[in-house]
Amino acid sequence: IIGALLLIYLGVFCYLNLYKYAQHVDSDIAAEALLAREIWTEKDIAPDDWISSTERRIIGMPTVASVFYGMTGSMQTAVGITCILLGAVFLGTFYYFLRKLSLGRPAAITALLVLCALPANGWRNEGQMVPFVTLLLFLFAEYYVFHGIFLFFGILFYLKLREERKLTKKGLLSWLVLFVVAVLLNCGGQRCLQVVILPLVVTEVIALFLESGHLREKLPGGRYLATGYLGSLVVAFLISCLYGGRGDYAVYLLNPKEAVEKLLITVPAAILENFGLAGNAKVGSFDSLIQLFLWAFLILLGYGIWYIFRKRSDVSDQEKRTVGILLTSVGVTAFIIGITSAEAAHYYFFMTWFAAAVIVAVLVEHLTGKQSAFAALI
């Protein structure tokens, strides 16, 4: 049943990408298609005559779509094919990521369905609701699909270095590829630094502090391979600063009163809205029913976090570290937005979707057989 529901979602995504692009297009979405055409016409990944509002990306959906535009001559068809292709690669990467964490197939497929079906917010067009998660990962624009793919491979490589504490030729090649991708992603903005690199660095600093007995004990040399890898990602960001691909717009630190109010009220509200809890639904209506289900789902996530990080837990260290990294990413984003004048847009917290999907997968994996009825309910 879970697999069938997932296929239905994927079929809907394919249909929307190929046949409903014009119905849901806006200025931001149209700009992605126009950029794809411009890249092909000028034969330049970052055309000089293209004026970017916030960033000049080197890799992104338009980069791939430009190839299909050259083949088809249609911006709409090119974007549709590209979004289907990249969405499939993204879901395949996420599935591979979950399986490498030793999660079973039912748990992994459930997580994929959660990622496709969970967010209930978005914008309406002719009575149809298009959740923002689909715009970010599956439909029309796919702004953060490359960040998601890089995140999953980056976490897996980090965990591998922490556990094996040695570097093979294959590992060195993987390191080099991830470093190059980090440079390219960072050239287009600070999102990669914010949602991938900084959370990994924070996680590593805390881990080193605890493993070294509060800096009193010396750790084996191989343990610092993971630290070196994260250091190289920071270097990748510094190298990308030479490119100058970010928009020159000012962000200011808030005064303490404003920062506390934003951290305690605005940011949590944005995270809740990110899941679809927007309010303004008449009690008894379908919208109110969906939002009640979302509240129940958030309670489930709270239980999942407790289950994963409790002292007597049968959850593996890999699974704990992965959930910890994803939650840290949400925390880093919340902190940066909370203390600055940056807009607290709900879709900036898209990492909560990944964290939620992994938490559900872990619960399904470990409760199946022990609490089969509860696992089936999830």
Positions of predicted regions on the chain:
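Membrane-interface alpha helices of multi-pass inner-membrane proteins
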Residues: 171-191, 196, 201, 231
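Short hydrophobic/aromatic helix or loop-helix immediately within or flanking a transmembrane segment
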Residues: 31-37, 51-74, 266-279
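Hydrophobic/aromatic-rich transmembrane helices and adjacent perimembrane loops
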Residues: 142-144, 194-195, 293-299, 303, ...
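Transmembrane-helix motifs of polytopic, lipid-linked glycan transferases
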Residues: 3, 81-110, 153, 302-307
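Membrane-interface helix-loop-helix junctions at transmembrane boundaries of multi-pass membrane enzymes
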Residues: 166-171, 208-226, 300-329, 340
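Membrane-proximal lumenal/periplasmic loop motifs of glycosylation machinery
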Residues: 18-27, 40-63, 77
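Signature aromatic-anchored transmembrane alpha helix within multi-pass, membrane-resident enzymes
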Residues: 1-7, 171-180, 226, 230, ...
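Membrane-interface micro-motifs in multi-pass membrane enzymes
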Residues: 25, 58, 105-162, 342-356, ...
